[in-house]
Amino acid sequence: MNLNNKTLIVTGVSSGIGAEVARLARFQGARVIGVDRHEPQLTLDSFFQADLGDPASIDALIEKLPVQVDALCNIAGVPGTAPVEVVAKVNYLGLRHLTQGLLPRIAPGGSIVNVASVLGAQWPERLELHKALAMTETYAEGQAWLAANPVAQETCYQYFKEALIVWTFQQSQAWFRDHSVRINCVAPGPVFTPILGDFVTMLGEERIARDGARMKRPAQADEVAEVIAFLCSDASRWINGVNLPVDGGLAATYV
């Protein structure tokens, strides 16, 4: 696995998995352009502040980014304790808007990696809804569809991670065929990051305790970052349209 001389855009770069991806990629010789609402505490080649839930902010960001990059790592996200409108904007609509805007700039052989979640595993149960949302082409159309098909606060995090997985699947073959760009998801389980406590609030202590009994421990952020870096590298050049669990086997315990 080698990222030498590649240019990566990493969102959510200021903490957690995003920060670890940036550190690892730079160690491997990549140029890393970070994006976040907050200033990072690590060395990057470039950094841009942006609100990834606001299409105007995303459009302004795209204007500042290089004309050619090798990979986009969509890591920024908010927990389900945020209002449902914010979860929709940051975890799905904004991510999609940024990715669509950058697709023409991603070099042939390039890669897009979306961070989903083990909590998105139930996407088959709402497949038709997720496919209908994926068929909306713009941020505004997606907002209008969601206004007509409201999502419950209690399950909004799961819903939009499911939707992200389905959207990734649906884009993968056409983008690979027409642009030679791969797009994949990684699906972490619990990870030691600043928002881990939000998941206790969101899911409840009983669910957290049950999952805790099924797994050895939460992941360290670097354990997920290494998988993302692999998916950005040429070593993964024939991996496309997958949702790769990075959960220490947690999902397998539900079979």
Regions of interest found by a model, annotated:
Residues 177, 182, 239-241:
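Short, small/polar-rich loop/turn modules that mediate ligand/substrate recognition or access, typified
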Residues 42-56:
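Rossmann-fold cofactor-recognition segment
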Residues 116-117, 182-194, 232, 245-247:
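Conserved SDR Rossmann-fold cofactor-binding beta-strand/turn motif
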Residues 126-136, 178, 191-213, 253-255:
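A glycine/serine/threonine-rich, flexible loop-to-helix segment
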Residues 11-23:
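N-terminal Rossmann NAD(P)H-binding glycine-rich loop of SDR-like oxidoreductase domains
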